[in-house]
Amino acid sequence: CLMIFLAVTLGFFAESLREHLADKKKEKQIIFALKKDLEKDTVRLYHLINMYIPEYHSWIDSSHNEIDSLPLKGNERRICKALFNSTYWEIYTPPVIAESILKDPSTFNLIKNEQVKTAILNYNADINDYTRYSEFLAGLQHSIDTSFVTLVNRQDARKLLDGLTIQNYFLEDSDIPKSIQFKTYDKAAFKIYLNRLDQIDFKIHDILGFYKIISEADIQLLKLFNDQYRLEK
C-alpha cells in the first residue's frame, strides 16, 4: 500500500511540475510577444511625437499665414495644400497584443509575476485614458473633414485624398491639382474654417501629452520585462 501511495504521490507531483513548467513557458511566450509589440509601439510613438505632430503644427501655422497674407485668387494650390495638410490625421492605435492579453483573463492570469501584472494594469489605465480622449478628438476631426468640402469642390477633394493614399504622409506640391478652384472666395469662410482647425490644434497638443505618457510606460515595461524574465533579443 505504501508503494502504491508513493507512486501516486510522485505521479501527482510530476504532473504538477509538468503543468508548472508548461505555464512558465507560456508566461514567457506571452511576455516575449508583448515585448515585441511594445518595441514596435515605441518606434510608432517616436514618429508621432518627434515628426508628425511638430510638422502638423507647422501646417496649421502655414494655413494661418497664407490665408492672412495672400489673396485667395491665384494662390489656390498653395493655400489648399496648407489647409489639406492641416486635416491629415495620423491616428495612434494601442498595441494589439497588450489589449488582447488584458481582454482574456485566462491569458493574463498565466502571468505570475505580481510586479509585472501591476505594471501592465497601470499601463492599461494610461491606454484607457488616451482612448477616451481620442474618441472625443475623432468626432472633431470628422466634423473638420466634412466641412472641408464647403471650401473645395468634392471632385478636387477626392483627388487630394487620392494623393494622400499614394503619399501616405503630408501632400507635396505635385499632389495638388493644377486646376483647383475654391467654391467660395470669401475670406470670412476661410477664417471660420481656421478657427475650427485651431480647436483641433489645441487637442493635438493634449494628445501629445498622452503619447509621451504611453511612450514612457512602454519603456518602463520593456525594462521590467528584461529585468524579470531575462528575455533575449
Where are these regions (language model features)?
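Long, hydrophobic alpha-helical segments that serve as membrane-spanning/inserting helices
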Residues: 16-233
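Membrane-embedded hydrophobic alpha-helical segments
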Residues: 1-21
